[in-house]
C-alpha cells in the first residue's frame, strides 16, 4: 500500500491509505509528567521491555549484540544476560507463566525460554517481520511493523486473530514495542516520539502520549528512537525508555 508521511510535532507517524472517508475525529494528545528517572544501559538497543517480580526484563537488538536480560530497576545493573546468537536481531519480549517469548526481526522465529534460567526451550516460526510483543495475560500480542496487531497462542505460536490500528480512519503503521496497561495496548510508533493507547477490541487509538523533549539535548546525543514501555501492575507505575538511552523514566499521563 502507498504510505503517507504525516509529521506530528517532533515525531513522525506513518499512516497507510485511509479506509474511512472523512472527517473522523483523531485521538487527543496527552501530556506527561516525569515521576522519576533511573539509569539505563547506553549499550542496550532496547527492543522489548516489561516489569515483573520487582525487576525489568529487557530484550535487545542489533546483529551480533542481541540478547535477553534481567535488570535491577534502581541501578540499571544487569543481573542476568543471555546472548541469542550473532545471526539474530532480537525484538519484542513478553512473559506468560514461567516462559519468556522473544521475537526476531527478519528470521521468522520466536524463541521460548525458561524464565528463571534463560534456557532456550523451543522456537516457533511465523511469517513476516517481528517487532513488538506483549500479553493480555493469556495470549501474546505481536506487531510486525505495519498497522496490524496479531494475537498469538503461546502454546504453539499460531495466530488467532488480527486487528488493524487506526486513528481518524487512517491506519497507523510502524507499530513497535508494546505493553498491556489496564486493558489497553500501548504502542511505540517507530521514528516517532509518541505512544499510542489502543483499544484492543476495535484497534482505534484512544489517545496519544507525546514524549518529545523527555531527554535533554545532552542526554539525546548518540541515542536512537523512543522504544520500550513497561508497566508495574502492583505499583501502578509506567516506565519508558529508548534504544541506547541513558535513562529509563517513570511517567504519569495527564
Residue ranges and their predicted role:
Residues 22-43, 73-79, 212:
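A short helix->beta-strand "capping" segment at the edge of beta-propeller domains
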Residues 35-67, 82-94, 242-244:
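Beta-strand-rich domains and repeat architectures in extracellular enzymes and scaffolds
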Residues 36-38, 79, 83-86, 162-171, ...:
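Surface-exposed loop and turn segments in beta-propeller and other repeat-based domains
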Residues 42-53, 86-97, 126-139, 169-183, ...:
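Beta-rich, blade/repeat-based domains predominating
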Residues 58-62, 100-107, 142-146, 187-191, ...:
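Conserved beta-strand positions in repeat-built beta-propeller and related beta-rich domains
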Amino acid at each position: 500500500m502507498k504510505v503517507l508521511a504525516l509529521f506530528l510535532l517532533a515525531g513522525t507517524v506513518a499512516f497507510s491509505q485511509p479506509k474511512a472517508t472523512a472527517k473522523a475525529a483523531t485521538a487527543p494528545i496527552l501530556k506527561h509528567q516525569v515521576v522519576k528517572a533511573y539509569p539505563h544501559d547506553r549499550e542496550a538497543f532496547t527492543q522489548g521491555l516489561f516489569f515483573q517480580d520487582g525487576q525489568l526484563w529487557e530484550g535487545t537488538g542489533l546483529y551480533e549484540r542481541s540478547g535477553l536480560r534481567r535488570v535491577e530497576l534502581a541501578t540499571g545493573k544487569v543481573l542476568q544476560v543471555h546472548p541469542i546468537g550473532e545471526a539474530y536481531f532480537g525484538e519484542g519480549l513478553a512473559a506468560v507463566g514461567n516462559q519468556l517469548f522473544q521475537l526476531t526481526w527478519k528470521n521468522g522465529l520466536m524463541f521460548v525460554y525458561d524464565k528463571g534460567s534463560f534456557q532456550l526451550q523451543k522456537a516457533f516460526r511465523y511469517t513476516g517481520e517481528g517487532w513488538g510483543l506483549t500479553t493480555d495475560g493469556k495470549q501474546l500480542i505481536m506487531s510486525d511493523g505495519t498497522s496490524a496487531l496479531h494475537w498469538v497462542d503461546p502454546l504453539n505460536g499460531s495466530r488467532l486473530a488480527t486487528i488493524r490500528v487506526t486513528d481518524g480512519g487512517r491506519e497507523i503503521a510502524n507499530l513497535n514495542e508494546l505493553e498491556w496497561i489496564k486493558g489497553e495496548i500501548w504502542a511505540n510508533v517507530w521514528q516517532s516520539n509518541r505512544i499510542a493507547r489502543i483499544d484492543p477490541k476495535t484497534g482505534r487509538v484512544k489517545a496519544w502520549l507525546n514524549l518529545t523533549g523527555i531527554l535533554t539535548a545532552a542526554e539525546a546525543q548518540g541515542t536512537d528512537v523512543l522504544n520500550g514501555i513497561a508497566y508495574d501492575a502492583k505499583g501502578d507505575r509506567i516506565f519508558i525508555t529508548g534504544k541506547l538511552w541513558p535513562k529509563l523514566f517513570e511517567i504519569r499521563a495527564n
